[in-house]
UniProtKB/Swiss-Prot annotation:
It comes from Methanosphaerula palustris (strain ATCC BAA-1556 / DSM 19958 / E1-9c). This is DNA ligase. The active site is at 247 (n6-amp-lysine intermediate). It catalyses: ATP + (deoxyribonucleotide)n-3'-hydroxyl + 5'-phospho-(deoxyribonucleotide)m = (deoxyribonucleotide)n+m + AMP + diphosphate. ATP binds at residues 245, 252, 267, 296, 336, 408, 414. The gene is lig. Belongs to the ATP-dependent DNA ligase family. GO terms for biological process: cell division; DNA biosynthetic process; DNA recombination; DNA repair; lagging strand elongation.
């Protein structure tokens, strides 16, 4: 397939409104693709170049991309950036920008999908002092060989957001329709392979190609997620008894071991082995089996109590000074699930069976404590214990649940203190991406400090597409400054925002940040003078610390 045909396909899909129409349109194309093009087409369609688990990363930021496009157009990068600021969509802006320039280099070639993929592979492989130059040269060649229309989708692909409204579920169902297999079979294969491109290749073989698949070390699996909102009585009523574990204030990890080699992956499936060597060493010595384990890394303070999760997160992101950081902060793994052992895939076993295998695999030192309980009173007591020890709450797990990679469902439920809310004024925003490209995607919030607004946090979660349009209408005439992707508003609109925790943070002028901020509503009934003050925010922060130290007041 030529990239020009891929771009036309994207445009046709972008113009579609219905998911079923999109699914069918994709399913018609798939059987015509070669074995080489099929996985590339699938990944590109989802705005990806490499599988999520792949160590290959493109490493191209907007500035380098804009520099390459400006060179092809024979003009300055600032002119392109100005156009992007006005449109809010880099792909459309680049198309318009190149269309207005006479550039004889266009169409010297009509690259195929495979050629574009090969160029991206060269970019990902570039390293050393000349890597930036090498990447720029490849980008120039790519954009010099496509039309302005094709450049729209090439730019979006490189930036990782195709903006055509295609999700994993649509592609999954299109694969099923194209090759006459069940969507559930495609989903199961996706859970094992974590790459819909490879799943499509397997599906070409029919049902036989999708069965007997197994997960394997060093190919990370999306992590199963928990949902909030379900109560303790509801879980017990549904399941009779549940496994109850502490909900740790740490960072999720996946541990892979084969022989004497181990690797650790973050929730984003990025390898972080070198950043947290003590975790790998601990678990490597804890088992002789080849395994894939799921758990949480927590940081422990000198008093034996857990430290905030940002402490662990900083370690996960660290590239240098690992030895010194290791001396300063104690990291401990808490393992609560096992997905694979000695060649056997375990995700289709019930949780209680996986737990029994896990207990026999790593021993008690790093095993997350668990109790199987059947009464709300017993769960309440464990919840109190978790809070008193400085944890976030408890996890309730269905003993019969299978491991569903990447799924947030009712089989795992987190019980935490009720979410508090703050009233904060909106002082700025960032333009959105994807479906939010022509609206504001996230909003900057502030509290009041002696007549001065101090930034506290950004919020993007909890806002529906309809609300985004309403908020755009509300704010569009209140823009007082714009720079790059950010705008500044007159501080007149108040948001009520829920949050899980107030945290110390140098990232915002107030000195605080909100963990898991979520939009609740616009407070039209409040004046700006009534918003949260820095003093009251500090009071909330200190009270929150007191609760964590063993005097909690909460509602179950």
């Amino acid at each position: 397939m030529q990239f020009s045909i891929f771009a036309q396909t994207c445009a046709a899909l972008e113009a579609q409104n219905g998911r079923l129409e999109m699914k069918h349109a994709i399913s018609v194309i798939l059987p015509s693709l070669s074995g080489e093009d099929l996985p590339i087409f699938i990944r590109f369609l989802m705005g990806k170049i490499f599988p999520d688990w792949s160590p290959q990363k493109l490493g191209i930021g907007p500035n380098l991309l804009y520099e390459a496009v400006a060179y092809v157009a024979g003009t300055k990068k600032t002119a392109l950036v100005d156009l992007i600021n006005r449109t809010g969509d880099a792909g459309l802006a680049i198309e318009q920008f190149l269309a207005t320039k006479e550039q004889t280099a266009f169409f010297t070639e009509d690259p195929s999908l495979a050629e574009v993929y090969a160029a991206c592979t060269r970019i990902a492989a570039s390293a050393g002092g000349r890597s930036q130059r090498e990447r720029l040269l490849v980008l120039r060649q790519l954009f010099g060989n496509v039309s302005p229309f094709e450049a729209r989708y090439l730019a979006r692909l490189i930036l990782g957001e195709l903006r055509i409204g295609i999700g994993e579920g649509t592609v999954r169902d299109a694969i099923a329709e194209a090759y006459t297999v069940e969507p559930a079979q495609v989903e199961h294969a996706m859970q094992a392979l974590n790459d819909l491109g490879e799943v499509a290749l397997r599906a070409r073989e029919g049902e036989e190609g999708l069965i007997h698949l197994s997960i394997a070390p060093f190919r990370p699996v999306k992590m199963m997620l928990a949902q909030a909102g379900t109560t303790i009585p509801e879980m017990l009523a549904a399941h009779g008894e549940v496994a109850v574990e502490f909900k740790y204030d740490g960072t999720r990890f996946q541990f892979h071991k084969e022989g004497k080699t181990c690797r650790i992956y973050s929730r984003k499936l990025e390898e972080v082995t070198d950043a947290v060597p003590e975790v790998g060493e601990a678990l490597l010595g804890a088992t002789d089996h080849d395994v894939i384990l799921d758990g949480e890394v927590i940081a422990i303070g000198a008093d034996g109590r857990p430290l905030p999760f940002q402490t662990v997160l900083r370690r996960f992101r660290r590239k240098h000074g690992i030895a010194a950081a290791r001396e300063a902060i104690t990291l401990v793994p808490r393992v609560f699930d096992i997905l694979y052992r000695d060649g056997e895939t375990l995700i289709d076993l019930p949780f209680q069976s996986r737990r029994a295998i896990l207990s026999a695999t790593i021993g008690p030192e790093y095993l997350a404590p668990q109790q199987v309980l059947s009464s709300a009173e017993a769960v309440d007591l464990l919840y109190l214990e978790a809070m008193a020890e400085g944890h976030e709450g408890v996890m309730l797990k269905d003993l019969l649940s299978l491991y569903s990679p990447g799924v947030r469902g009712k089989h795992w439920v987190k019980i935490k203190p009720e979410v508090e809310t703050l009233d904060l004024v909106v002082i700025g925003a960032e333009w959105g991406e994807g479906r939010r490209a022509r609206t504001f995607g996230s909003f900057l919030l502030a509290c009041l400090d002696q007549g001065v607004f101090r930034a506290v946090s950004k919020v993007a979660t909890g806002i529906s597409d309809e609300q985004l349009q309403e908020l755009y209408t509300l704010f569009k005439d209140q823009v007082i400054a714009e720079s790059g992707n950010t705008v500044t508003f007159e501080p007149t609109v108040i948001f009520e925002v829920g949050y899980a925790e107030i945290q110390k943070s140098p990232s915002y002028e107030s000195g605080y940040a909100l963990r898991f901020p979520r939009f609740v509503q616009v407070r039209d009934d409040k004046a700006v003078e009534e918003i949260e003050t820095l003093e009251s925010l500090t009071t909330r922060y200190l009270a929150q610390k007191t609760q964590a130290n063993g005097q909690p007041e909460f509602t179950l």
